[in-house]
C-alpha cells in the first residue's frame, strides 16, 4: 500500500468516526478513542475493563540409533523420544486487572548402540527447549479536575 492510499483511507476513517460518534457530556477515555457510549455507562465503565492472556509452549524430540553386522551376527538398536507441553490462560476483569502468564518446556533425548565382531556403532542426540511469556494490564485512570471551573 503506497502512502497516498494510506492517507486517503485514514482521512475516510477519521471522517466516519466523526460522523458516527455521539456527543456525551462526560467524555470517557473510550469515547476519545473513537467509540461512543451511552451516558448511563460512563460512571460504571471501570467494571467493563478486562485483560486476557494466553500462552502455549510445546517441545518434541526423537532420537534413534541402529547398528548391525549381519548375516545373523551382532546387531544393536536404541531409541529415545520425549514431548512436553504447557498451556496457560488468564482472564481478569475489574478496575485494576493485571495478567501475567509464563510457560516453559524442555525435552532431551540420547540413544547409543555398539556392536563388536568387525565393529558397528551408532549414536543419536536430541534437545529441544521452548518458552513463552504474556503480560497485560487494564486500568481506568482517574481524571484530574484540579484548577478547572465548572
Curated annotation (Swiss-Prot):
Keywords: Signal
Region ranges (Disordered): 57-82, 119-150
GO biological process: mucilage biosynthetic process; seed coat development
Annotated Gene Ontology cellular component terms: apoplast
Keyword Signal in record: yes
Record's signal peptide: 1-21
Biased segments, Low complexity type: 57-67, 119-135
Family: Belongs to the UPF0540 family.
Protein name, per record: UPF0540 protein At1g62060
Species the sequence originates in: Arabidopsis thaliana (Mouse-ear cress)
